[in-house]
Amino acid sequence: MKQFVQRAGGRIGLWGGLLAAALAAFAAGWLVPARAPVGCKLNELTAAPDFSPFSPAAPAVATSDAGTPAAPSLPEKWVCLTLDDGPSKTTPEVLAALDAAGVHGTFFVVATGYNEKYLPLLTQAAAAGHQIALHSASHEYSDIYRSSAAYWKDIALLKQRIAPYVDAESIRYLRFPGGSTNTVSRRYGGKGLMPQLKTEVEQRGWQWVDWNVCAEDAVGGHPSADTIYRNVVRETGEQTHCVVLMHDSATTRTTAEALPDIIRWYADNGYTFLTVAEALPLG
């Protein structure tokens, strides 16, 4: 590249053009923020033998590779389709795909201020039978993982912002940004923060929810719908109890395109679609 610029007579117009193109791509949602990949694949973060996507306090509905039998009321094979980081301009397409298939999903929502105009979609999603769960107000790791107090302040702000659209006080399911085994929290709150937060969630009678299938739809490069579909099929493998991580943010529009094929594959392979609350009912 240095030689190319020198041959071009030292002009910087090329760099200005590249910068302008990159900024335009980011604005259009084709470039994914650097924080998005954190926590996508739990087994790449910390060793998690006998991994279950649910809190330890959960009933016996752990994943099949954990060797824990399903609760009697649950089907032999089930899948929870979960979507993080919405609502956004992508959410109507996601809802349309789910509704067309007669399938209910679970939305772990954010309320960053940037997506404020899409928050009314939560009312529509809840009315259609989809589950609304908590994710983060800001999704800024450096803010929410400074301390336990900072994390719960963020959750309180999230509930406040979504309260006009859903019954926020009744929500008892959440997903930690980056997942429960994320390592990014250690940079800001220390090694003991995540164990503390998990304990505090359980003490409230809530459940935190991870995943055991990652669509890898937010790992950068704007993966195609076909790539997302193949990622889900590959990661599902022989598992019979699946919690699938996907996103309905403005930067993951191809996830909505992939959903019909993902749903069809699970249906063809004998899976029953559940919300997280159906797979993990709380008393």
Regions found by a protein language model. Give the residues of each.
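Catalytic domains of cell-wall/extracellular-matrix polysaccharide-remodeling enzymes
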Residues: H139-L245, S249-A267, Y271-T272, E278-L282
